[in-house]
Amino acid sequence: MRQYEMMIIIDPSQDERTVAPSLDKYLDIVRKENGSVEKVDIWGKRRLEYPINKKDEGIYVVLDLKCESATVLEIDRLLNINDQILRTKVLRKDQ
């Protein structure tokens, strides 16, 4: 298993209190595949450098995951299907 850092930018129209519960269904995929969620860091609403889908702000979330690469690819695919997700970025952490 490898360490990954995933940054997610969520549509600012979503209430910040509902961000963690809405991400739980994606994090459950990691847990079911014998991975672990090391940290969930919700930065809150921030201004974007450039507009994404005509939005100037987004809710930033940073996840630290320990899982297989196929699991990360599946989560990224599912997040990109979701209309509330503006952008995702996955980085493999150095050991």
UniProtKB/Swiss-Prot annotation:
Protein's UniProt name: Small ribosomal subunit protein bS6
Role noted for this protein: Binds together with bS18 to 16S ribosomal RNA.
Superkingdom of the organism of origin: Bacteria
RNA-binding found in the keyword field: yes
Keywords (A to Z) from UniProt: Ribonucleoprotein, Ribosomal protein, RNA-binding, rRNA-binding
A cellular-component GO term for this protein: ribosome
Disulfide bonds: none
MF (Gene Ontology): small ribosomal subunit rRNA binding; structural constituent of ribosome
Gene3D superfamilies: 3.30.70.60
GO BP, sorted A to Z: translation
Database matches in CDD domains: bS6
Family (UniProt): Belongs to the bacterial ribosomal protein bS6 family.
Gene that encodes the chain: rpsF
InterPro entries with a match to the protein in the record: Ribosomal_bS6, Ribosomal_bS6_sf, Ribosomal_S6_plastid/chlpt, Transl_elong_EF1B/ribsomal_bS6
